[in-house]
């Protein structure tokens, strides 16, 4: 499966959608839309983020990673999803730079990384998607700092 560049901007909602789909294996796009108060288009953004992270399959069935998370670490769903993001080839590079250079500007670097791995999009798309990744990484960094 070719990975789709993420469009979901709220990482907490990605985790929530993943948990909902996992706990409701027969759910439909409309079920998720009703649960989250989303349009069907927004559901697709968040489901695609879950697919990108290998949390659900194309048909929304459970992946081996999802089963492992809920079987072995059910109290640590967020931590495991965050770990998956950090280990991602694209997002991990951006996360590492943000850790190493906390006061730096990260969006231009993120755009360059995203362009390298996902050629063929417009500059506006690169800027939006890279901004989402930077937001996700900031969220994870804040979470790590709070956990100590």
Task: Give each language-model segment a name.
Residues 1-148:
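Donor-sugar nucleotide-binding helix/loop cap in glycosyltransferases
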């Amino acid at each position: 499966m070719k990975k789709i560049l993420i469009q979901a901007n709220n990482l907490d909602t990605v985790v929530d959608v993943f948990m909902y789909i996992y706990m409701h294996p027969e759910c439909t796009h409309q079920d998720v839309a009703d649960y989250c108060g989303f349009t069907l288009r927004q559901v697709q953004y968040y489901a695609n983020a879950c697919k990108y992270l290998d949390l659900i399959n194309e048909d929304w069935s459970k992946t081996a990673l999802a089963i492992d998370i809920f079987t072995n670490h059910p109290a640590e769903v967020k931590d495991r999803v965050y770990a998956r993001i950090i280990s991602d080839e694209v997002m991990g590079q951006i996360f590492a730079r943000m850790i190493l250079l906390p006061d730096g500007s990260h969006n231009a670097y993120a755009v360059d990384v995203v362009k390298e791995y996902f050629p063929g999009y417009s500059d506006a798309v690169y800027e939006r998607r890279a901004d989402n990744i930077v937001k996700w990484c900031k969220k994870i960094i804040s979470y790590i700092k709070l956990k100590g």
